[in-house]
């Protein structure tokens, strides 16, 4: 993966505020605590990300690399360096994007069982805690946690770098183009044709072995590429995370 330090996620103008009531035992009055969530500068919808993850899984399966099979309500992605990301669907119209960068996430420990770490949920809706639970289930650190409300992504307003960068994780077409190029290079394949890669990204979970073969070309037939395995891996994503 690229080694450049990620930018702190930019937050466009606008924020939402969730209000919690805290009652002091020494006073009859209640204090009102405001904790804002800020919009995340990410245009990709949950469906867009699910489609990109299907392509990533197809390429990895075709070249013989491990990938996470989709589960109902959750798509998990990780690489050997310790980076991971998950797309979760807690309910209709809702989604969570959770993950961790092994070098750049400074919100360390919030997903590990037994460690409090940085609070990434705060007073956001309770279903955001599904992201923390997912990290703990995988015994993984949690660096970032974003919630989708049906129209855009939101994050808790906290100062520490969470390690998320859309150029490093498979959440944009540009990022996945780079990932496909790197996977082809790492497995000694020819440099992928850019137009063929674009067609593959557009196809998403409906990609075919022929479309995959146009991207993963082996000189002289070596190393071998299992295009059918790649197409099967992509098809598994068609109904794994329903909208």
Model-derived features: positions:
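Short, solvent-exposed aromatic-acidic interface loops
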Residues: 99-107
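N-terminal domain-onset segments
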Residues: 27-82, 91-92, 107-243
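Low-acidity, Ser/Thr- and Arg-rich intrinsically disordered low-complexity segments
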Residues: 5-30
